[in-house]
Design a protein with these regions (language model features):
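Acidic donor-binding loop of glycosyltransferase active sites
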Residues: 65-79, 92
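C-terminal "capping" alpha-helix adjacent to the active site of nucleotide-linked donor transferases
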Residues: 113, 117-136
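Short glycine/acidic-rich beta->alpha loop that forms part of the nucleotide-sugar donor binding site
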Residues: 78-81, 88, 98
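Acidic, amphipathic alpha-helical patches
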Residues: 57-61, 102, 121
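Short acidic/histidine- and often glycine-rich active-site loop of Leloir-type glycosyltransferases
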Residues: 99-109, 113-114
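A charged, aromatic-enriched C-terminal amphipathic alpha-helix characteristic of glycosyltransferases
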Residues: 116, 133-163
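Short alpha-helical segment that forms part of, or immediately flanks, the ligand-binding pocket
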Residues: 61, 84-89, 103-104
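Conserved catalytic-core segment of nucleotide-activated headgroup transferases in glycan assembly
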Residues: 1-49, 53
């Protein structure tokens, strides 16, 4: 059960590692892959936190395709989150806190979960890792959305968002 975090470590990786301590307690067969550079201590290795091997886009695509869930809390400074969009296109459910643009990238209870607190983040991750029917429901919805976003779609979303905030 591979989980992945493919964004920068300053995008609330500390929150994720704290959450992972609880997630791993509930899911001893789960692994969390994070982006380098990051100092993975023996304590984190014992929690099955591993560094991805960065490199070509093919490496990233293969890492995403071999993962079950993307865990990405988000960050207040994030205005788009390409990592979440990549996960969406590869039909990978996301568990997030919805910080920054993540609340726009995830449809709660359809393409992933937007947690309101640490407990929900842990519980949503646990559910997706262990409930095959739920995982397949999310994946099916993501498959139906695949290749539906293009430049004009994203531009219209931005215009609508700006209009709502006037």
């Amino acid at each position: 059960k591979k989980c992945i975090f493919t964004t920068k470590s300053d995008r609330n990786l500390d929150f994720l590692i704290n959450a992972w301590r609880q997630i791993y307690t509930l899911n001893k067969d789960a692994e969390l892959y994070i982006n380098p550079p990051y100092n993975v201590s023996q304590d984190l290795i014992n929690l099955k936190i591993k560094l991805r091997h960065k490199g070509s886009k093919n490496n990233l695509i293969n890492d995403l395709k071999s993962s079950k869930i993307m865990l990405v809390p988000g960050h207040k400074g994030e205005v788009f989150c390409l990592a979440a969009e990549e996960a969406r296109e590869l039909c990978l459910p996301i568990v997030t806190m919805g910080y920054g643009s993540l609340y726009e990238r995830v449809e709660h209870n359809k393409t992933g979960y937007i947690a309101r607190n640490l407990n929900e983040f842990v519980n949503y991750t646990h559910k997706l890792l262990n409930d095959k029917d739920l995982y397949l429901k999310f994946r099916s919805h993501l498959l139906s959305l695949r290749n539906t976003r293009n430049f004009s779609h994203v531009a219209n979303e931005l215009i609508n968002l700006i209009s709502q905030n006037k």
